[in-house]
Amino acid sequence: MKLIIANRGAHDIGKTTAIKNVFANLYAKYAPTTTIYEPLNIADLAYNWVDVKATIKIGSTLVGIESQGDPGSRMQQSVDDFVAWGCEIILVACRNQGDTINTITNLESNHGYTVLWLQNGKCTDPACWQKLEEKYGNWIADIIEKCALTRTLSPTYL
């Protein structure tokens, strides 16, 4: 099974925050099988402007996580790295159009990945938005964990 989960959306909708929440959730369970490439100090993830690039081994499945998804970011290089390292599941942020979308569709057409396009919600109330991001991150982490452990993508996981 090869799966890429693309958290897409416009600038400042919370894509990076959601992916960092997914990472935190999975890291809490799988820290011994995690390799963090960015940032060099995990404590820096508490800052909004810091992105994460990491791999996590869940069962026998390697998962790649990249929270940078802006055009011109390291997203393309991270995806190339994840494919070269044998990641069967990749989670990335991306915009709604342009180079980041092209990177993902290339994985589908040239590397056999199934694409799961997702988009987090937004709320004008900050407390509501924070809770929404937390629940969304937990949901994605749950999908990743189930897919990794069963090595399948089932509609029941969604």
Predicted regions mapped to residue ranges:
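Glycine/serine-rich loop-strand microenvironments at binding/catalytic pocket rims
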Residues: 1-4, 114-116
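Glycine-rich phosphate-binding P-loop
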Residues: 3-27
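Phosphate/oxyanion-binding active-site loops and adjacent basic polyanion-contact surfaces
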Residues: 15, 67-75, 132-140
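Short, glycine/charged-enriched secondary-structure capping and boundary segments
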Residues: 22, 80, 104-107
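Active-site catalytic pocket residues across diverse enzymes, especially alpha/beta-hydrolases
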Residues: 26, 30, 108
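Conserved nucleotide-sensing/catalytic segment adjacent to the nucleotide-binding pocket
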Residues: 31-95, 101
